[in-house]
């Protein structure tokens, strides 16, 4: 694959022998912020002792929320790509897809809070470790980090997650449907053609309430990013197994960070026509090792899934070498491999 400039420029300061690296873009962004001055806070409209909001009718608030949400539901009832699961892999996939303004992307996340396990590092600690060369993705989205020889450390995992979400959700071709569950797949012949959706609270209470039918979202491509096994994990591949479209889901093996991250990126693929698997769900379907609290493979697996989706849509992508947008050397796309698994 093609490579951009090798070394990323940075400014550094001493921190107990460790360099603090901030991407050049981040430096420019901070440089544009206006310096705080007394005049900024002395303006009458910012007088906190006499602060007054403009009046509004309660019904206007209700209409604005309802109209906009329902419009998005109508818009994405038939969409290009549905990403199921808004963890670090799903968000990275959606971010990469959203660079093409003509690709309509819907993200489904059953939690009220997107981000999956990427709000914290391991064992509820706050730092996030990312092995090189995946740190170049952090440079692109302007997340600062401490740089060591073979890896970088973000001081708090939430810095990555909040940054990528704010950049992604600002794009007009992306909609996040959080508190929404994917209850099932739409299958036509041998192809996944969309997802069956419901409010997450409804999906979790089918046993306590009378029958509550779902909704649907058709898609040209479904990206399953449902994480590793658990009450709500690996749901995409487990459903494929239950209907006989794949033979087995052996589950991930014991932890091996070095083997796990390479394997997850390499084997991110279209497992059946119309459905791409990314992130830790790849380890579940392949029986490859779990990686523990390192996150680089989640980001790059998500990027690879995006390019697989672009390829499936017949659009320029890095796998075919015809991608014209900004591509970074961290995209290890293994384009010589067979991208569709045999069921």
Curated annotation (Swiss-Prot):
Protein name: Thiamine thiazole synthase 4, chloroplastic
Class of the enzyme per the UniProt entry, highest EC level: transferase
Gene Ontology terms: cellular component: chloroplast stroma; cytosol
Assembly behavior: Homooctamer.
Changes after translation: During the catalytic reaction, a sulfide is transferred from Cys-211 to a reaction intermediate, generating a dehydroalanine residue.
Stated family: Belongs to the THI4 family.
Biological process terms in GO annotation: thiamine biosynthetic process; thiazole biosynthetic process
HAMAP family referenced in this protein's UniProt entry, alphabetically: THI4
Keyword Metal-binding listed: yes
Pfam families per UniProt: Thi4
């Amino acid at each position: 694959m093609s490579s951009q400039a090798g070394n990323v420029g940075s400014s550094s300061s001493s921190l107990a022998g460790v360099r603090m690296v901030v991407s050049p873009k981040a430096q420019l962004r901070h440089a544009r912020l206006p310096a705080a001055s007394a005049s900024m806070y002395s303006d009458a409209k910012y007088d906190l002792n006499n602060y007054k909001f403009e009046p509004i009718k309660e019904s206007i608030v209700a209409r604005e929320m309802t109209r906009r949400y329902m419009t998005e539901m109508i818009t994405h009832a038939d969409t290009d790509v549905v990403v199921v699961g808004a963890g670090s892999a799903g968000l990275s996939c959606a971010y990469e897809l959203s660079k093409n303004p003509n690709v309509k992307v819907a993200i489904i996340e059953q939690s009220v809070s997107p981000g999956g396990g990427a709000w914290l590092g391991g064992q509820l600690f706050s730092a996030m470790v990312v092995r090189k060369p995946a740190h170049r993705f952090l440079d692109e989205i302007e997340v600062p980090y401490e740089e060591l020889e073979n890896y970088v450390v973000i001081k708090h995992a939430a810095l990555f997650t909040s940054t990528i979400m704010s950049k992604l959700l600002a794009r007009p071709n992306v909609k996040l449907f959080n508190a929404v569950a994917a209850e099932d797949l739409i299958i036509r012949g041998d192809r996944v053609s969309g997802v069956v959706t419901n409010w997450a609270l409804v999906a979790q209470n089918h046993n306590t309430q009378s029958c509550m039918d779902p909704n649907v979202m058709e898609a040209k491509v479904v990206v399953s990013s449902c994480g590793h096994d658990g009450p709500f994990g690996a749901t995409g591949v487990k459903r494929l197994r239950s209907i006989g479209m794949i033979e087995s889901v052996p589950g991930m093996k014991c932890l091996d960070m070095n083997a796990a991250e390479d394997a997850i990126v390499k084997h991110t693929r279209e497992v059946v026509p119309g459905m791409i698997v990314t992130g830790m769900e790849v380890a579940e379907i392949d029986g490859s090792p779990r990686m523990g609290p390192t996150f680089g493979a989640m980001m790059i697996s998500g990027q690879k899934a995006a390019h697989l989706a672009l390829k499936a849509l017949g659009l320029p992508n890095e796998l075919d070498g015809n991608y014209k947008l900004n591509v970074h050397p961290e995209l290890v796309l293994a384009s010589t491999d067979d991208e569709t698994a045999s069921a």
